Amino acid sequence: MQNTTLHIRHLGQQDYESVWHAMQHYTDTRNNDSPDELWIVEHPPVFTQGQAGKSEHILNPGDIPVIQVDRGGQVTYHGPGQLVVYPLLDIKRSKIGVRQLVTYIEQSIIDMLAKYTINAYAKADAPGVYVDERKVASLGLRIRKGCSFHGLALNVDMDLAPFRRINPCGYAGLEMVQCRELGGPQTVIEAGDQLIITLSQLLGYQHLVHHQGLAAS
């Protein structure tokens, strides 16, 4: 049965590992009655290497830490000025397939950017969202016990230079772009507020409940 309520957790800026472990804990301990949640966060500079990641795609990390994680995909960069959204959803309960969830996430970003007259699109062979062949958003999910965690990263107003220290998502020379350059949302808060609307609508949630910070464990 579809759960029509989505809980939104606004986490502010939090270090990557603590949020990652909190996602794992929430997913491992949830049951059939646990609410679906969307976590909105920014991370300090960090490279994360997905399960398909190859070390040769990390060219010159320098002083930015590299963390091996349990999501799909290859290496990406997180940093201040980037909107990170983690959908912690019981997709088995909602009867949403993994591919369908990826499509919904990509489409929510496309729909949000369309409000700013930005023509963004997805690619069948390279998950994420693009504008004029430049990547504005990256995706990497994990499904455990029929529930999703990890999620999406949307470049809003950030230093894109660290992306040049890696082959983003395993693609050498892939050019990144951000919302500020495109005339899109200018802040992470603005982008998050808009993306919550488009994503919750596509996923079929009718009620949104907002929280500051993580629930006490």
Swiss-Prot record:
Catalysis: reaction(s): octanoyl-[ACP] + L-lysyl-[protein] = N(6)-octanoyl-L-lysyl-[protein] + holo-[ACP] + H(+)
Record domain BPL/LPL catalytic: where: 32-207
Keywords attached to this entry: Acyltransferase, Cytoplasm, Transferase
SUPFAM superfamilies associated with the record: Class II aaRS and biotin synthetases
One BP term from GO: protein modification process
Site (Lowers pKa of active site Cys): K135
Predominant subcellular localization, coarse grouping: cytoplasm
Statement: the UniProt record of this protein carries the keyword Ubl conjugation: no
Presence of keyword Transferase: yes
GO MF term list: lipoyl(octanoyl) transferase activity
Matches recorded under Pfam families: LplA-B_cat
Subcellular location, record wording: Cytoplasm
Top-rank taxon, per record: Bacteria
Positions that bind substrate: R71, G72, G73, Q74, V75, T76, Y77, H78, S138, L139, G140, G151, L152, A153
InterPro entries from the UniProt entry: aa-tRNA-synth_II/BPL/LPL, BPL_LPL_catalytic, Octanoyltransferase, Octanoyltransferase_CS
Biological function: Catalyzes the transfer of endogenously produced octanoic acid from octanoyl-acyl-carrier-protein onto the lipoyl domains of lipoate-dependent enzymes. Lipoyl-ACP can also act as a substrate although octanoyl-ACP is likely to be the physiological substrate.
HAMAP family xref list: LipB
UniProt miscellaneous comment: In the reaction, the free carboxyl group of octanoic acid is attached via an amide linkage to the epsilon-amino group of a specific lysine residue of lipoyl domains of lipoate-dependent enzymes.
Protein name: Octanoyltransferase
